[in-house]
Amino acid sequence: MAKQDWMVVGITCMVIALSGASRVCAGEQGQPTVGQAYPALASGVLKKAVLVEMDPGTLLTSEGLEIKASRITEAVEAADPGVKEELEKNRFFLLEQETVKALLLEEAASSGADQQGLSEREVIQAHLDRKFRDIQVSDEEAKAFYDANKETVGGLAFEQVKEPVKEVLARQKRQGSVASYLQGLGRNREIRVNRDWVQAQHAPAMDNLVDRARRSGKPTMVEFGAEGCVPCDMMQPILDRLRKKYPDELNVVFVHVGENRILGARYGIRSIPVQVFYDENGDELFRHVGFYAEPEVLKQLAKLGVE
């Protein structure tokens, strides 16, 4: 199958873009949330966490849950050398992942399923498998995908690629369902994070290709991909033409997810290629998965005022 499904990285349990979390808001607490103070920092479960003063050794508290700074430091030190440098700049991301892990373990325990002899990772995986094992893809859905992505299957007939297409779509469907489920984690609980620590993490986390472009004041198109991925390689000439056509009007950014695994995880990249379009304020307006034909790209750019 030419379209490559590429899992970016598992730091603690999974790397999935999250959105939504605690219902705590600044109006209730009189203190800002992470999402209000640092809009681009949190990718999900901590967006609505309240920033409060804490002991330097404590990073997060919430109804029986406490995460210490030492836990994040240990995770960085134990990381693969290939991602350790990137993790040093993304400790807040690790805190989010540790929070997701803890909340998922709570959910799994409350389900009453037998966990004897299982590792934490196995408990989480079994819990998610039980919840989303019945997801299927119809022939009609597979055909619609095939019709929209004929360029990536090398001219093969639908019947020749139907089953691989259905496997990829089912995997993506499960990932989407998991993401929706994760949106509800922590929704009914108060989550508090260390104000000073989060402030210190903001600058290093924003020091990357994507966030710098989003803060430039110009519209931005980001391509998340990798070399050797057929649809990714097909996108490169399009990106080159865009750079030449709009040198002053548009940021065109390519992120190699193999070399920027944490950045890809932060931006919820589960399959490649992915094209994400941001307006001049850095707000995401649209994203697309798979090869994206140049006429369609130009339509999205026109919506951003780039013509």
How should these model regions be labeled?
Residues 1-89, 148, 191, 207, ...:
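Short, low-structural-confidence N-terminal segments
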Residues 26-51, 152-216:
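A C-terminal, polar beta->alpha supersecondary segment
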Residues 217-220, 224-228, 271:
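Short pre-active-site segment immediately N-terminal to redox-active cysteine/selenocysteine motifs
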Residues 224, 243, 248-261:
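Thiol-based oxidoreductase modules, predominantly thioredoxin-like and allied folds used
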Residues 268-276:
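Structural micro-motif
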Residues 279-307:
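Non-catalytic, surface beta->alpha helical segment in thiol-disulfide oxidoreductase systems
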